Amino acid sequence: MPTQSLGRAGEEATAQYLIERGCFVVEKNYRPAGRHEELDLIACDGRYLLFVEVKTRKQGTASAFCAQLAVTPAKQKRILLGAQKFLLDHSNYTCYQPRFDVACVTMLDNRVVQLDYYPNAFEAMGME
């Protein structure tokens, strides 16, 4: 499976995971105008506005073990900037508490074999 297709499959699996837990998906692959950041998923659970970074890997690869480590401080800062831009452009969501989550999806033969979800994986404090 090509890397982009693998990533999209992981994002779809994560969106379904969130929907099954009562969230609704606000945006997929949100890219603020004039910015380089892309937010994989934005969802809402009624209390929090979830900005979800999805990392998808093939089972059996070295990178599958440490997918969550791929969300570096630099990547966290880009996610934060994208989230700020989203909230500026969508004031109807400012009543929700933002939360930054990470989903690690492992796939084998075009199917999800594991989905680990880390709510509040990092915080905005100290990154501004």
Language model regions located:
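Short acidic/glycine-enriched loop/turn segments that link adjacent beta-strands
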Residues: 3, 34-36, 111
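Short, low-complexity, polybasic intrinsically disordered segments
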Residues: 105-128
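Catalytic cores of nucleic-acid endonucleases
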Residues: 33, 56-106
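Hydrophobic/aromatic beta-strand patches that form the interior of the parallel beta-sheet core
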Residues: 26, 52, 101-103
